[in-house]
Every structure is written in structure tokens, then in C-alpha cells.
Amino acid sequence: MLRFAVIGHKAVSTPDFSLNDMPGGAGRMDVLCRCINASFFLSHDLRRDTECFLILKGGEQADPANTVTLRFSGEKIKSLNPDERSAGALIKKALVTIPEEEYQRAAPGISIRKSGLAKLLEEHPFAVLDENGEDIRTAETLPENFILSDHQNFTEEEMELIKDLPKYSVGPRVLHADHTIIIILNEFDRRGEQA
């Protein structure tokens, strides 16, 4: 199972956002929607052995008390279409569910809980995508879990949490998070490994 965790630094964690204003009023939710689509879509199918975690930090005034994690499972997800609005609608629907400490089903293939990066790192051995990391094309083996940031850099607190994790790069240039996910999945495909 491949896993991608994307931190949405300004992403709202309540359902009261407009699907017509995901870049602004929803805190760059559009970036996260593209990451969901990149994680799952093939030309005529979905990647069923992939999960995508979105860590929504609660909007402009990010507050750890408002941070939620959404887990999207390719094995069970329904009603996902290859456009940002479809992914945004699924996020909005999931956020109607009041999060608790453990994952709760919010929709088919989507779970929500009240937590952030620290708890996710306790559960899975993640690697960080960083332009200064080991190149995925020359790495002998690749990890199955990757952390990415949205359009912003990791915060100091996040850097402290991930400082000892292995770092990998998809190349010499900084790319959008969704493009990076596609390149990683392509590398797994080229190696003939399940993704």
C-alpha cells in the first residue's frame, strides 16, 4: 500500500466553504484536491492500493485544536471524478462528520479524525519529499509512505517532527505536490512494483 500525506497549512477544517472558491475561501483546498486526484486516477481506473491523507490545519488562523486528518482509501472510494470540484465535494461532505480521536467513516472510502501530523507519524514510517533528498530514480529501494507540503514550506514545528526521516527527491526542481505524487507513482509503475 502506497501512502501520501499532504499538509494543508491554510486549508479549512469545516464544511462551510464554497466549491466555487476553493483557492481562496477554503485555504488552497484546490491544491489538496489535485493531490487526491493524482494519488488515485489512471486513464480508465483508480489505483486501489493507494491511500492519501490530507492534514487540514483549520484555515488562516491555524489552530492545533481544529486540525483534522482525512484518509482517502483507493480500495473503497466512491463518487470520485477527475476534477477538483468532485474531490472538493467529497472533502466538504467528509467535514460534515464531527471528528473524534479515532477515524470514523465519513463517506465510502473516506475517514476523518481529529489529529495531525504527529499522530500519523506514529502509525506509518514516512519519508519526506525534499528537493535535497536522495533521487528516486537512483534509490535502490523506495519507501511506501511519503509526506508532502502544499504550496507552503513545512513549518518549524513540522520540520522538528520530520527532521530524522529519510528524504527523497523527484528531481532538481521544486514541483507542485500533485505533480510530485504522479512522478513517484510513475517510478513505482516503471519498477514494476504495485502502486
UniProtKB/Swiss-Prot annotation:
CC terms in the record's Gene Ontology section: cytoplasm
EC number(s) from the headed UniProt entry: 2.1.1.257
TM regions (residue ranges): none
Catalytic activity: pseudouridine(54) in tRNA + S-adenosyl-L-methionine = N(1)-methylpseudouridine(54) in tRNA + S-adenosyl-L-homocysteine + H(+)
One Pfam family matching this protein: Methyltrn_RNA_2
Keyword Signal found: no
Binding site residues for S-adenosyl-L-methionine: 129
Principal subcellular localisation of the protein: cytoplasm
Superkingdom assignment: Archaea
Gene Ontology terms, MF aspect: S-adenosylmethionine-dependent methyltransferase activity; tRNA methyltransferase activity
Subcellular location: Cytoplasm
Keywords per UniProt: Cytoplasm, Methyltransferase, S-adenosyl-L-methionine, Transferase, tRNA processing
GO biological process: tRNA methylation
UniProt record similarity statement: Belongs to the methyltransferase superfamily. TrmY family.
Subunit structure: Homodimer.
Annotated protein name in UniProt: tRNA (pseudouridine(54)-N(1))-methyltransferase
Gene: trmY
